[in-house]
């Protein structure tokens, strides 16, 4: 890695929050790493009270990156490349603070300038100070120049895909550029949704009910430690539209159910909330991510069979089950996808994903669908789900599957959809939830 960048995982001393933010942003932009991996790996390097600021800066920079980049172009004569890229990322941090946080300007500038020392880039101290102070002096004029055109804050390839698919593409882009609300899923084995809402109110936490029977929307986000009985499994944090997975699967006690691509386990635990006596198999190809599944099961006081395996190769992992000639009553396939429906929550997706990724994802989805169909019982249910808004991963994928598999029948869903549509597409413009797609398939008996 570059001279000025510490390996985040090997840091052993506390660094400035701004320095760590710059390192994280550099790794997102130049190495394709995700915030969901980098921030947990670095949070031990900041004071507990500074963690929200670290998250705000990193997610915020990724959310409005093109605007910040345009501003830097106006302020820096020569692009900061190579070993100086970390300084460029530090300027992104500084500009974000000045534009989008309530930190006093003088304090924000001082902290960012001081971060050059932590990054062993002290000789750029004057440049950083000069650029940020010039921005403060010329802010009004600069922003008029930068904002004279409507900016999507999305990569062009994704905007073009959205334009092709949706007449209201601008609304989708606009929704993606806003912070999402915090949604809770109430464990119906412990409390009704209304009862838990009362418990929240007693703690001074306001919440609204939704069409989804398990969901509550917090008017203001809070730390999970503030949620009543969170560590006892009374509630989980999960988007309202993601919560439909277990509800549409409609598991029943005594059934053998596969949660494919299960990590981090939110859907696994919801299935067990709906059917506590079901035998649930949680499968994921990444062993490290299965740790989260175990943690969630422990918090919810539930049991499931957790297996590391490739969903495209059932024969390799079915042997780990005690049942012989295994076939599942129900399968939830939350397929690997572009995650273009959850950009509000993960704005780095805009810069991590490339147009060329989509065809590979579509091919993988097709392969997994076909493989898992072979281990579904006759008359069994497979629920296909993605957190994508791209038709080729969703309706077009299922249309092709139905064409190729005469024993597959599309089941109705309890949503009002466009006549003739295949499955149902939630958009981030609709109900305060993320973009999700669902299609419910039954294996018909010939």
Curated annotation (Swiss-Prot):
PANTHER family reported for this sequence: NOL1_NOP2_SUN FAMILY PROTEIN _ ANTITERMINATION NUSB DOMAIN-CONTAINING PROTEIN (PTHR22807:SF61), NOP2 YEAST -RELATED NOL1/NOP2/FMU SUN DOMAIN-CONTAINING (PTHR22807)
Name by which UniProt lists this protein: Ribosomal RNA small subunit methyltransferase B
EC id: 2.1.1.176
UniProt organism field: Pasteurella multocida (strain Pm70)
Role: Specifically methylates the cytosine at position 967 (m5C967) of 16S rRNA.
Superkingdom as given in the UniProt entry: Bacteria
Subcellular location: Cytoplasm
Keyword Transcription: no
Gene Ontology MF terms: RNA binding; rRNA (cytosine-C5-)-methyltransferase activity
Catalysed reactions, as listed in the record: cytidine(967) in 16S rRNA + S-adenosyl-L-methionine = 5-methylcytidine(967) in 16S rRNA + S-adenosyl-L-homocysteine + H(+)
GO cellular component, one term: cytosol
GO BP term, example: regulation of DNA-templated transcription
Record family assignment: Belongs to the class I-like SAM-binding methyltransferase superfamily. RsmB/NOP family.
EC class: transferase
Binding-site positions, S-adenosyl-L-methionine: 261-267, 284, 310, 334
Catalytic residues, chain numbering: 387 (nucleophile)
PROSITE patterns linked to this entry: NOL1_NOP2_SUN (PS01153), SAM_MT_RSMB_NOP (PS51686)
Alphabetized UniProt keyword annotations: Cytoplasm, Methyltransferase, Ribosome biogenesis, RNA-binding, rRNA processing, S-adenosyl-L-methionine, Transferase
């Amino acid at each position: 890695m570059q001279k000025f960048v510490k390996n985040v995982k090997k840091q052993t001393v506390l660094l400035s929050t701004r320095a760590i933010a710059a390192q994280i942003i550099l790794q997102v932009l130049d190495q394709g790493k995700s915030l969901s991996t980098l921030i947990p790996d670095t949070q031990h390097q900041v004071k507990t009270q500074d963690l929200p600021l670290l998250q705000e800066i990193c997610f915020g920079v990724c959310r409005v990156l093109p605007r910040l980049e345009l501003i830097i172009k106006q302020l820096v004569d020569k692009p900061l490349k190579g070993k100086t890229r970390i300084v460029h990322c530090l300027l992104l941090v500084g500009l974000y603070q000045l534009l989008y946080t309530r930190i006093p300007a003088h304090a924000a500038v001082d902290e960012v300038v001081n971060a050059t020392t932590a990054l062993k880039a002290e000789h750029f101290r004057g440049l950083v100070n000069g650029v940020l102070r010039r921005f403060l002096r010329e802010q009004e004029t600069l922003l008029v120049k930068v904002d004279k055109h409507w900016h999507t804050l999305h990569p062009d390839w994704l905007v073009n895909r959205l334009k092709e698919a949706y007449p209201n593409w601008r609304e989708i882009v606009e929704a993606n550029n806003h912070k999402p609300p915090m949604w809770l899923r109430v464990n119906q084995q412990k409390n009704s949704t209304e009862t838990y809402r009362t418990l929240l109110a007693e703690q001074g936490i306001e919440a609204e009910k939704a069409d989804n029977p398990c969901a509550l929307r917090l008017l203001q986000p809070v730390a999970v430690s503030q949620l009543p009985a969170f560590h006892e499994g009374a509630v989980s944090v999960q988007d309202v539209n993601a919560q439909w997975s277990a509800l549409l699967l409609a598991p029943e006690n005594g059934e053998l159910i596969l949660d494919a691509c299960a990590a981090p386990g939110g859907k696994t635990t919801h299935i067990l909330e709906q059917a506590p006596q079901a035998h649930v198999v949680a499968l994921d190809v990444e062993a490290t991510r299965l740790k989260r599944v175990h943690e969630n099961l422990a918090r919810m006081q539930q049991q499931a069979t957790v297996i590391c395996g490739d969903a495209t190769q059932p024969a390799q992992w079915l042997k780990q089950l005690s049942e012989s000639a295994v076939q599942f009553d129900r399968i939830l396939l939350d397929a690997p996808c572009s995650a273009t429906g959850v950009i509000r929550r993960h704005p780095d997706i805009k810069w991590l994903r490339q147009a060329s990724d989509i065809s590979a994802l579509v091919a993988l989805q097709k392969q997994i669908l076909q493989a898992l169909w072979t281990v579904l019982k006759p008359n069994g249910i497979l629920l296909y789900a993605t957190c994508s808004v791209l038709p080729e991963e969703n309706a077009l994928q299922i249309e092709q599957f139905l064409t190729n598999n005469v024993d597959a029948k599309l089941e109705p869903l309890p949503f009002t959809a466009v006549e003739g549509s295949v499955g149902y597409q939630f958009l981030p413009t609709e109900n305060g939830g993320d973009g999700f797609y669902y299609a419910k398939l039954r294996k018909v008996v010939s």
